[in-house]
Amino acid sequence: IVSPPVCGNYFVEVGEECDCGLPRNCQNQCCNATTCKLIPGAQCEDGECCERCQFKGAGNVCRPRRSKCDIAESCTGQSPDCPTDRFRRNGVSCLNN
């Protein structure tokens, strides 16, 4: 049995763009708690690449490199999420010498 989405339960479900709980409890300025939709003009409501309801610009580092083999990840300007953690390609030496 599949139940319909419920706005106000803190879970983003099918048809919702955000869900910050009941209107009296909502602390998210980007989300309309009554409709579970982003407020007009908002691109996002949460994520490493979301700031003040807008996507951070392309090139903003969202995950710095942690080792010589790691590659720093940057926001794309098109998503609230930081891209998948990536590493240098196989065959490239990254030992600490």
From Swiss-Prot:
Lineage, broadest ranks: Eukaryota, Metazoa, Chordata, Craniata, Vertebrata
Family (UniProt): Belongs to the venom metalloproteinase (M12B) family. P-III subfamily. P-IIIa sub-subfamily.
Motif (D/ECD-tripeptide): 68-70
Cofactor: Zn(2+)
EC number: 3.4.24.-
Superkingdom, natural source: Eukaryota
GO cellular component terms, semicolon-separated: extracellular region; plasma membrane
Name recorded for this polypeptide: Zinc metalloproteinase-disintegrin-like bothrojarin-4
Originating organism: Bothrops jararaca (Jararaca)
SMART domains registered for this protein in UniProt: DISIN
GO molecular function terms noted in the UniProt entry: metal ion binding; metallopeptidase activity; toxin activity
Subunit relationships: Monomer.
